[in-house]
Amino acid sequence: SGNMEYGPTKNVLVSGCTLISTSAAIKIGTEGTGNFENLIVNNCIISDSNRGISIQIRDGGSVKNASFSDIIIETRRFADCWWGCGEPITISTHDRDEQTKSGHISGIRFRNITCDSENGVFLSGSDGNHIEDVLFENVTVTLRNKSKWPKGRYDLRPGYGQKIEEIPSAGFYMRRADDVTLRN
């Protein structure tokens, strides 16, 4: 859904896959001018990846009604300069630049997810554009050092004025996010 000429991405099912990536194993955005709707990812294994599941909205497209369930995620950092800092799940919405406003993220569900990673789950909305209606149910996050790269960092790139921020690693770190539920 990178260019509007291709239209929206709707009604997608990903199931029973083993995914390995030195970037993000599952990525929604960043170049998404069309909307992403009704996405289901289940019964997958993500291993040896820099990021597990990444929803990054920068170019006007929105994400709504996405469900991730029964997934094992193992992440680690590969280099200090690459996008991402070993997050198993990252969700962010930030403007690409002064002219390109980011879309909205809402209705995201994570169920029965096991994470073994160098960093925690990271949610970052922007001023006036908060992430909304996110559920984490039976999500386990184990933090372990696996690489030589610095810890305690979260990566907001790409985006207008966005950078890597030094924030102590936590199982879950959220800001500018409303109606977020952690259950079990």
Task: Label every model-predicted segment.
Residues 1-184:
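Extracellular/periplasmic carbohydrate-active domains that bind, remodel
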